[in-house]
């Protein structure tokens, strides 16, 4: 099902069939206060005994990215299946959020505002997940935030990306070299914005604990591979977040 090469896994489209603990049908629609105005948000409710809370950030808004993106939705469903309350929001200028697109700079502040809201609402350890642009702007502030315990980069854009300028933008991820939190990177093996060689080179420089999963046959948008994406996130959460937290509780380190 999963082929291992060091810490890198390659999936070939077979089902993991993990049992979910909880999946909420309760969705709260609201606005949270951001640094550039109100941010449109959705919260999928968690279980009463939730152990973590999570936020999932969407891809580039100038190319149609919103909180309703399919990859964002499936990532949310994976996290919510463990009973975690999961927040999605539209960056400034996207959807009906206030403000204007800020080329990734102000959007990092939006991530901080979302983390603050999530912390104030639930007072739980947090998990950050971001897809594409969402990963590019959200991983840095999440690495620096002690309240965030685990990170998920989906389709992390390590290659040049045509953005809102004439020159394609290359995002930098050097900060990950100092990030010792639990980390999952999951991408399509044919990701046109995250070339495999560059992603593996970055992964080699990132400290443990970490995991890289490449889904065979998948492109940047995981077309036809969304189930595998969801199952990959579920498997990692079960292994790296749930089991790890339980072990720490038993040892008294939490």
Task: Report residues per predicted region.
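N-terminal cap/lid segment of alpha/beta-hydrolase-fold proteins
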Residues: 2, 12-49
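Gly/Ala-rich beta-loop-alpha elbow adjacent to hydrolase catalytic centers
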Residues: 130-138
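Catalytic histidine neighborhood in serine/cysteine hydrolases
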Residues: 205-221
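Acidic catalytic loop of the alpha/beta-hydrolase fold
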Residues: 189-194, 220-221
